[in-house]
Regions:
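Short, conserved catalytic or interaction motifs in soluble domains
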Residues: 28-31, 35, 58, 74, ...
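Catalytic strand-loop-helix junctions within cyclic-nucleotide turnover domains
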Residues: 71-82, 117-137, 154-157
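Cytosolic regulatory/linker segments at or just downstream of nucleotide-handling modules
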Residues: 124, 147, 153-199
């Protein structure tokens, strides 16, 4: 994609599974721990998440505070199923590694690291945006916005992985419905799913 072009305005419209994940209780953790400790927690967390995404063929685009934005591009010849399956597998691995890894908060006397993952499938614009001397490589579009809306439900539904109806309709993976949920800015309620491991 884009073959390494880095000029502002260069972009490509692609179909992709969008991944957004973020730490829970990040604000409280930032108040409890000194900045160097928080940096260590974030780096350890990001290393595990990025490794899980990359192992399944995903591409991490950016870190936004405690959040990760990534995509699993859809091959037009294969359809969305392989990308959806890869994103779901990465989500499961990331949560397993977080549970088995060092518990930075536990070692400091608090709870273990907890984070949520949200997955949605749609069309995105993939490319460079920003000022002439400061470019940001990212994806934008309604699919990204809806993934962010689903992110807010992780705390409400108390599930670590949430999957959109669009992905559920295009995958053969086993998923569990959490019912129809209202998403801010989306006209109709959307059915949301999770993996059986988090039902």
């Amino acid at each position: 994609m884009l073959q390494g072009q880095i000029y502002r305005g260069v972009n490509e419209t692609i179909e992709s599974v969008v991944w957004i994940s973020d730490l829970r209780r990040f604000t409280r953790m930032s108040d409890e721990f000194a900045p160097p400790v928080m940096l260590g927690i974030l780096n350890d967390h990001f290393e595990r998440v990025v490794g899980a995404i990359a192992a399944q063929g995903g591409e991490v685009l950016k870190f936004m505070g405690d959040s990760v934005l990534a995509i699993f591009p859809v091959d037009p010849e294969l359809g969305a199923r392989p990308a959806s399956r890869a994103a779901l597998a990465a989500g499961l691995v990331a949560t397993e590694q977080a549970a088995a890894g060092p518990r930075a908060r536990g070692e400091a006397g608090g709870d273990e690291i907890d984070f949520g993952i949200e997955l949605h499938h749609g069309t995105v614009v993939y490319g460079n945006i920003g000022a002439p001397d400061r470019l940001d490589f990212t994806v934008i579009g309604p699919a990204v916005n809806q993934t962010a809306r689903i992110e807010a439900l992780c705390r409400t539904l108390d599930r670590q992985v949430l999957v959109s109806q669009r992905i559920a309709e295009g995958t053969d993976a086993e998923l569990v419905s959490l019912g129809c949920q209202a998403l801010r800015g989306v006209r109709e309620p959307q059915e949301i799913f999770t993996l059986p491991e988090f039902a």
